[in-house]
């Protein structure tokens, strides 16, 4: 293994959970779902609305859903860029509280662009891209 991932944070949309499960198939790595890294915009396209927590727990028993509420608090009419920036900042602040060093984020392009290019801010702690074939 080129990388030993300590933890995976995954958007609780079905497509990202399936991606994370495929990337880490056969690997012993903890996966935690977190709403802050959901697709943008919330409240517009129904494909971006997550299932209820109870349903997700039944479908994916090996993923930790303890950090999300039963229904997403982010699903409302037409999320704006300011709200996306707030989600991104909240997730960044959350990551600073974690002890893990090698963290994988399985999310969505618009969220990740906001997070990586507008919110990380420390070149010495640059985030490395995680390619499945290097795991």
PLM features: residue spans?
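Short glycine/proline- and acidic residue-enriched helix-loop micro-motifs
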Residues: 60-80
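A short, acidic, amphipathic alpha-helical segment used as a generic capping/interface helix at domain edges
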Residues: 84-98
